[in-house]
């Protein structure tokens, strides 16, 4: 059961698992109801090392895809705070397990809010710039959370943290899929999945290791500052990313 449901556990005990089960059932039924779009040309290639590595090779050669994926690594490596929330809840905010549940849920609420807004918007103008802006905001939200000792300020920071992460994730996924040709998309998205999963775990490790050396708040604040700094560097390092005017231009 997700720790986002911590606040429900405090009041409903084991019944919270029924809530989680209901969510899984709805997700499964939604997936089953998806239409079958076929398998394209039906051509099957033999799997070998060259095929497996071709996704990484394509990412390295495509500057837009490389910039999009690596800025994700930067953001999650330096601004990951979710693994450190128990320390903030107990030692800094003094809000106990119920408060931890609220902290854990707040980024998800922010992400849901951002997703609802994005679903109503037309095609984004300058998606690359919006991506970098959102990650800068992500880093600033991390810094604010690290400095806060007041619950409502921490919640606002986490809300913005989750919302900006959703915006950047949405744009990253679209950019990578539109730029990548059909015959490479599966392999490139596999690389993207590996990078996303690995950077999340490495981010928690980085935060924990830094916290043991300089303290939890300075470690998180430094990570947020590095995220902002690297985002500015990426602005100049990958000029093609910020020059894309419209999503429609990506698959041309």
Residue spans of the language-model regions?
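Alpha-helical transmembrane-bundle signature of multi-pass membrane transport and export proteins
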Residues: 1-252
């Amino acid at each position: 059961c997700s720790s986002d449901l911590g606040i429900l556990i405090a009041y409903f005990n084991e019944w919270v698992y029924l809530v989680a089960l209901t969510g899984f059932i709805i997700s499964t039924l939604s997936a089953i109801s998806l239409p079958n779009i076929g398998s394209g040309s039906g051509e099957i290639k033999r799997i070998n090392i060259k095929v497996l590595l071709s996704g990484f090779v394509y990412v390295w050669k495509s500057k837009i895809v490389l910039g999009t994926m690596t800025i994700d690594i930067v953001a999650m490596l330096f601004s990951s705070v979710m693994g450190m929330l128990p320390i903030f809840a107990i030692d800094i905010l003094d809000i106990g397990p119920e408060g931890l549940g609220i902290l854990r849920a707040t980024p998800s609420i922010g992400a849901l809010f951002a997703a609802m807004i994005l679903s109503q918007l037309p095609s984004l103008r300058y998606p690359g710039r919006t991506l970098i802006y959102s990650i800068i905001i992500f880093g600033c939200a991390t810094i604010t959370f690290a400095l806060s000792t007041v619950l409502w300020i921490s919640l606002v920071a986490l809300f913005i943290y989750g919302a900006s992460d959703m915006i950047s994730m949405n744009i990253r996924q679209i950019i990578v899929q539109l730029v990548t040709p059909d015959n490479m998309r599966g392999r490139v998205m596999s690389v993207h999945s590996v990078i996303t999963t690995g950077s999340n775990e490495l981010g928690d490790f980085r935060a924990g290791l830094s916290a043991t050396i300089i303290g939890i708040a300075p470690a998180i604040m430094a990570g947020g500052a590095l995220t902002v700094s690297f985002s500015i560097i990426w602005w100049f390092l990958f000029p093609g990313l910020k020059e894309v005017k419209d999503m429609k231009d990506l698959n041309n």
